[in-house]
Every structure is written in C-alpha cells, then in structure tokens.
Swiss-Prot record:
Highest taxon of source: Eukaryota
InterPro entries: AsaB-like
Enzyme class: oxidoreductase
Molecular function GO labels: oxidoreductase activity
NCBIfam families: CmcJ_NvfI_EfuI
Enzyme Commission identifier(s): 1.-.-.-
Identification of the protein by name: Hydroxylase/desaturase efuI
Protein's pathway: Secondary metabolite biosynthesis; terpenoid biosynthesis
Example GO biological process: terpenoid biosynthetic process
Coiled coil ranges: none
Family that this chain belongs to: Belongs to the asaB hydroxylase/desaturase family.
Function summary: Hydroxylase/desaturase; part of the gene cluster that mediates the biosynthesis of enfumafungin, a glycosylated fernene-type triterpenoid with potent antifungal activity, mediated by its interaction with beta-1,3-glucan synthase and the fungal cell wall. The pathway begins with the terpene cyclase-glycosyl transferase fusion protein that most likely uses 2,3-oxidosqualene as substrate and catalyzes glycosylation immediately after cyclization.
Keywords per UniProt: Oxidoreductase
Amino acid sequence: MTAAVQSPTVNTTLNYFREVADGGLSEIRHGTVGSTRMKYNTQPVVVNDIRSNEGEFSLDKQGFQLVTSATKVKAFDEKTVKEQYYEELIDLIKETTGASFVLPMNHLVRQQLWESIHEIPADADDAAIVDTTAAPAMSVHIDQTPEGAELILQMLMQADAGRLGKTRWGIINAWRPLKLIRREPLAVCDVRSVPDSDLRVLGVIYPLPDGMVYNGSSDLKSDTWNVAANPEHKWYYASNMTPDEVLLLKMYDTKLDGRARKCPHSAFKRSYDEGPARESIETRCLVFWEDQERE
C-alpha cells in the first residue's frame, strides 16, 4: 500500500470548550466515565506542518519547541522511566532552557486508540472508573492555570516551595513518540494567537493515591484551562515524528516579560491516519531558574 502524500497543511477539526450555558461542564472528576462524556464545540481548523522551518519555533516565543534528542531507553516501564528516562529529560531541558533545576513530576504512556475509552455502554454510571490516560487527549487544553501550577509547586516541593517559588519557575511537558507517528499527532497552538479571553477554567478533581491526604482530603482539586474556539488561532504540528525527537510544551512560566507562558494543545485526526494505536510518552516537569527573578 502506498502511503498518502502529506501536505504542509492539514484540514481537520479540534474539540474546543463548550460553554456551560450550551451544555458544557465547569468541573470533572478525572478517570471516570463522566469525564469521557464531556461535550465540546468541535470546529474546523488548519494545522500547519513545521517541517523545514523547525528553528523558527521556541518555548519562549510560541510556547513550544521541537528538539532532536535520541534516548538510550528501550523499555518504558514505570521503573525504567523513573530511573533512566527522567535523567535524560533533566539534561535535555536544562540544556534547552538554561534551567538550573528540573524535577520530572509524572508521565503518561499512551498506547490505546482514542475510540477505546469512548466505547462505554450508555447505561454506565458517570462515577464508574475508567482509564482515560492511555489514549490521545482529543480536546484543546492547557494542563494548568497559574493557580493550578502554584498548587503543584506547594504539593511537590513542600518545605522548598517558599524558597524556589521566589525565583523564576515553570512547568514544561516533554512529548516523545515511542514509534513513528502515523496517526493522531499532537497539535500545538502559537500562544500569541490566543487572547486570555479565550481561556476557560475547568476544575478537575483527582483522586489521590491510596493513603495519601492533602489538606485533609483524599481528593485533590486543581484547575486546568480549556480553550474557546477562535478562527485566529494558529495551529502547528511536526509530521512523522520519530522516537529521536521531543516536542517541548510550556504549561506555565512565572516570567511576565512578554515571553510565552503557556501552550494550548490537542491530538487531532487526519484523513490518511493509519496503523495501530499511537504510542507516546508525555512527561511533566517542574523547571527552575534559580539565578533569575520570579517576574
């Protein structure tokens, strides 16, 4: 079978936030059937391929950056990722950003079809548990609001949060294919094309691991951003990404000097997508520049 010829632009649709007045949600419980039933405002968009001009895009300018960085890791099980892969990412992010301290927080290995988590019986209870993290995330979002990012800092750094929080810090996601991407690639939006008026807070309730309590609760409520549709948004992706490449996305940055501080993103479908489920690993990292002022 001959592979489809890829165009420098892709006409597709993205799932934007549906306003609450139109049936959307303002809060979900992560990992439940109810969260998979969230309704969106699906809109046509054009996604531009950055191949041949990758160097024009950076974390501080558009909010994302493609870097070439082969990994020595062969197996992406929990133990190997935390003991070996995290160390590679720490070095990569320090080298790319000039950060002095990088702390990988968690990671998601995605290797299921998006359809698999949506083939749920209509009579299933909204509160029933379902794994929603193993498939591509097919909605436009930013992982943390500033308040959500501050909550993560306080939770993970605890006694050091006060000291580190006085310097410049942020959150960066590192997205790497585990195999050549043939379907549902990741789209990223130039944040300069996204006014704050397009951002919508979505509260997410996360059940904490067994035995863990935060502020007296076994649940953690944090805020993320969903994004309302706007034809002015500028969308991009890197075609045919390989395991030797990493797409860095900025989720938060304390600097208020005009640089990019966030990056809306979403997986998307193309008419010529083919093959088995996409395989990727996404790692979320706290990043600190201890030699720079917070703002």
